[in-house]
Each structure stands twice: as structure tokens, then as C-alpha cells.
Amino acid sequence: SRGLGDVYKRQSESIFYSFKKFDENEFFFALRDGYPVTPLHTLIVPQRHIISYFELNPVEHQNLFPFLERQKNKILSEDPSVTAFNIGINDGPDAGRSVHHLHIHLIPRRPGDIENPQGGVRGVIPSKQKYTKKDLKK
């Protein structure tokens, strides 16, 4: 049976371990997306090779958001034109997952980067992205 240390050492099982990390701690590392949606698009990846967000253990959950916040602050210090972020996880093939190692997208947004950002993550189903307050009352 594998111990926790062995789980953290299964680096050859994930594509991400060959990429250039620019920040890491005991639980997560950060790297730039190879196909960025916007400049400085960052991936937050657990050190432990897991596939789903729902496999994070309680300690990883506790450490995820401080690490995410740290990456947000790095982006803001590098590019003050960033005014917003999209945060996303494609958890499962039907959600668009193509890499079988959990990773969280931190996508910096800037004024005017698209004509109308309304709906944000609702754009995963294009017909649902645009809506009005009237639509919400239905």
C-alpha cells in the first residue's frame, strides 16, 4: 500500500510536472497556461496527483484559497491593468476536462478584453451566457 509520501512522488503520472513552475508550496504549484486565454493565465495544480476537485483532502482545501490569493496578488503586481478574474475548473470529461490532473484556471481580465463580459462562466453553454434581469425572473 502506498503512503501519502508515495502519492506526492508520483510525478511521472502528470503532464504538469514537466512544465516550468514559478511558485509552489507543500500542496500546490503555479504555472502559466500553455494555451492562455489572456496574458498571465495561470494554472493552480495540486502537488498530489488527483483528477477531481472533489478528491482534495481537508488540508488541501484549507490551503487552496490562500495559494490562489497569492497568485492573484502576483498577477496584479505584474500587470496593474488587470481588474477582474475568472476562476474555473473543468471537472470531468463532460465539463471539458482534457488533462487528467486537477488544475484551477486563474484567468486575468482587463477592461475591454471582450465586447460584453456579461455572463462570464455561463459561457460554457454559449446559449446561456447572455441574459437579462427579466430572464432571471422566469
Describe each model-derived feature in a short phrase.
Residues S1-Y8:
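Short, small-residue-biased leader/transition segments that mark boundaries at the very start
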Residues K9-E13, G96, P108-K138:
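Conserved His + Asp/Glu catalytic blocks
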Residues Y17-P36:
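Short beta-strand/loop segment at the start of cytosolic alpha/beta domains
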Residues Q47, D91-P111:
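Histidine-centered catalytic micro-motifs
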Residues E60-E78:
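Long, well-ordered alpha-helical scaffolding segments within enzyme catalytic domains
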Residues P80-G92:
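A short glycine-rich, hydrophobically flanked beta-strand micro-motif that places a catalytic Asp/Glu
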